Amino acid sequence: MTKQTLTELEQHELFLTRHIGPDADEQQAMLNYVGAESLEDLTAQIVPESIRLGRELNVGASNGEAAGLAYIRQLADKNQVFKSYIGMGYHGTEVPNVILRNVLENPGWYTAYTPYQPEIAQGRLEAILNFQQLSIDLTGLDLASASLLDEATAAAEAMALAKRVSKAKKANTFFVADDVFPQTLDVVKTRAECFGFDIVTGPAAEAANHDDLFGALFQYTNRQGQLTDFTELFAQLRAKNVIVTVGADIMSLVLLKSPGAMGADVVFGSAQRFGVPMGFGGPHAAFFVSKDEHKRSMPGRIIGVSKDTRGKTALRMAMQTREQHIRREKANSNICTAQVLLANMASFYAVFHGPQGLKVIANRIHRLTDILAAGLAAKGVTVLNTQWFDTLSFKVDVDAVRARALAAGVNLRYDADGVVGVSLAETTTRADVAELFDIILGAGHGLDVAAIDADILAKGSSSIPAALVREEAFLTHPTFNSYHSETEMMRYIKRLENKDLALNHSMISLGSCTMKLNAAVEMIPVSWPEFANMHPFCPSEQAQGYTQLIGELSDWLVDITGYDAVCMQPNSGAQGEYAGLLAIRKYHESRGEGHRDVCLIPQSAHGTNPASAQLAGMKVVVTACDKQGNVDLDDLRAKAAEVAENLSCIMITYPSTHGVYEETVREICDIIHQHGGQVYLDGANMNAQVGLTAPGFIGADVSHLNLHKTFAIPHGGGGPGMGPIGVKKHLAPFVAGHAVVKQGIESDNNGAVSAAPFGSAGILPISWMYIKLLGSKGLKQSTQTAMLNANYLTKKLSEHYPVLYRGRNDRIAHECIIDMRPLKEASGVTEMDVAKRLNDYGFHAPTMSFPVAGTLMIEPTESESKAELDRFIEAMVAIRGEIARVESGEWPVDNNPLANAPHTMDDIMDPAFDSRPYSRELAVFPTESVRANKFWPTVNRIDDVYGDRNLFCACVPMSDYE
């Protein structure tokens, strides 16, 4: 009989052993190799004693998968999923099961990273290009982004673009029509305050009466559901050099005249209605489309068409010089993570339904709205909007209607002025319309849906006037007209997936990105209707499950970070930075020190840091780093003293972007506090802190947390993300507020930074499950194992490559930087060559040239096994041997496996390959482990310069893919 106790047999910590890659024996072997007796001994060697936490976390014990699912099922069951006709940018939708199963629930799609390595990302790049084509066609404009975070932040980006490109250079006022969504106005006002813009609101028709405008914003259709032909108004505004921006409903554009045809300069909106659940506010992809002449001022990523070295059509991210990782504080936006997974879902939705299928859906929604309007009119209810697509507004006995609606499990929109609104959706049926008659009119109304429908068919409908009926063709590309059976759709999705390298194939060692396991059990609740189908503006009593989940997750994050409160609203790390800096700004203003506007940022900082500081209305002053990569204290003291009167804050990353624990971090905090500033600690590297130290304990005042890094939300190929901020008590009143829903800790006058009060709440169950399953012990052990993996890999690679920057006891924290510059000087081989050659070995490249040009930054997470680490090491050692052959002159600098990487099937089938000085086998099967699990790049190295000089960002002819 076994000697194990019942507690041991119950395996409460089984998930912990599944999440962590190396088993106990492998961990000990690795510890022996790096010269440590245990994980605790290694921790003591790495983490400065002055900042060690000195306590265990208090987030509970570890749990098994079944127990974790049972706990979260209890929370889900506390949510009441009513039929929500609230609208306001959030609508019911049917997620095609072929997309649900093969994209949303498929690690081949949700575990990939942003396509910085396009040769191994052609599948999702094509899906994103489809999203851009969809956006271009429906809006009637020229150039679309790869997605933004949500509709409201897209509106703020539209305002910023308008200011950049407007010829009315002296104008400082932005007009917002008073019938836009309230959350949109809220986010726009927040951004405008930072930029010093004046916001004026009023009826849309009065926009042209203002003379000092650089831009204007309109909603199409508006909050009440009214349709307006803006063609004449837009012409008047353009004559005054006003940039016209429009928030549009994507489903309505299937039937309506496009804003581009009316003369809009920029059109944005949410793609949520195209097969993405409401998720209590997100995540959803926003579309953003502009005229071609504004392309250099566009925010966010843009996918463009280029050529590879064989002349084959290939896709890649275009015009990256606009972005934060290059332009820093001069960037158009701080957008980094966006919503690629959700953009892909929306694009696949359009591909699956095609233009004809979309017309059927849109016409059904519109017909049901016509039926509802006709029935109400027949019973004496006056519909306030005279034209509509899917939304009606009317005045009735609000109390009686609300009571009947709640009794029926239905949510309507109740405006402050006694107006009731109803927005219909793809999920609405004729039975639902009959139920709405009962709710609005009471029993005994005698209306029959079929009879009203027959009458409308006979007499026609004028709710969409002829001038607003769409005449432009859309989605004519073959991609949107070829995959309408589930078999063909499934195979199309699979063909694209096969072109991409994700975590389900191999380790992704991107430094500062924390590409850890996104466990299946953590992902499961995301698809549950109790989480997926909740409207963010539903009555709070219906969302008790979400309320408890968000509360518990916030409490855990408070314990982990050492802060006093958490704000869940920011829906990306960059938005978290922005929100944290706004809290600092408002704190200073509350003390009569609004002049404090200088943000100190070390030269090694993430590009989002200076970009976010600029968005928050701050001036960036860069501080130096010493030769070891640490913040130069002498320079910091001098800069802090120099700007003391105006010092707002410092933004630091810990461990540093150089991958070490700086011994002087508390001194850094003290210097800033002594001069009246606040400390913003970037949470990008939190995976090396959890359970060992904490930003609040160190001395920081505010941090954002990348839940899509440290807390297991997947990267989705470029989003979604979540960037909640933790704050000390004195900053808590200054976190983001919301015009529609209060969160509980913010002051009333705080503006919003995201469209939804709790950001992308639909993915918070992932992080909740991650913490619930690992518990206090597992979280700490995960951090320690991540550091063990990093130090093991570093010591192995240091025998072949120079390693920059080490901390105490010659250790690194959780990532290392390999210096390729000496090898480049000796051989001509670049860090780019090594990155592309790793593709041939089946690996995604590490982070290139950040934070130091000419380097590779490698971060192996705790989820990677010793076997996978050894396979990566084997690849890097083999590549070093290849570099040596170039160095010795055996291979020419311009014709070797590195210079020609990555290699494709086309290469090895080409008879001309025989002229190369290396074999086909070495090109594509450089090691036996590669032969056993080969990943084939589908294009050769892509010409970025060609792509930007010949910018094309829409779908190409099908023949180009052949």
From Swiss-Prot:
Q: What class of enzyme is it?
A: oxidoreductase
Return the Gene3D superfamilies for the record: Aspartate Aminotransferase, domain 1 (3.90.1150.10), Type I PLP-dependent aspartate aminotransferase-like (Major domain) (3.40.640.10)
- Identify the CDD domains for this entry: GDC-P
Write down the species: Shewanella amazonensis (strain ATCC BAA-1098 / SB2B)
UniProt-recorded name of the protein: Glycine dehydrogenase (decarboxylating)
| Assigned keywords, A-Z | Oxidoreductase, Pyridoxal phosphate
Instruction: Write down any Gene Ontology CC term.
Output: cytosol
Q: Which residues carry this modification: N6-(pyridoxal phosphate)lysine?
A: K709
Q: Which GO terms describe its biological process?
A: glycine decarboxylation via glycine cleavage system
Similarity annotation: Belongs to the GcvP family.
> Which cofactor names does the annotation list?
pyridoxal 5'-phosphate
Q: How does it assemble?
A: The glycine cleavage system is composed of four proteins: P, T, L and H.
Under Enzyme Commission nomenclature, its number is 1.4.4.2
HAMAP family xref list: GcvP
Primary role = The glycine cleavage system catalyzes the degradation of glycine. The P protein binds the alpha-amino group of glycine through its pyridoxal phosphate cofactor; CO(2) is released and the remaining methylamine moiety is then transferred to the lipoamide cofactor of the H protein.
Tree of life domain: Bacteria
The GO terms describing molecular function are:
glycine binding; glycine dehydrogenase (decarboxylating) activity; pyridoxal phosphate binding
Catalytic activity field = N(6)-[(R)-lipoyl]-L-lysyl-[glycine-cleavage complex H protein] + glycine + H(+) = N(6)-[(R)-S(8)-aminomethyldihydrolipoyl]-L-lysyl-[glycine-cleavage complex H protein] + CO2
Q: Which SUPFAM superfamilies match?
A: PLP-dependent transferases
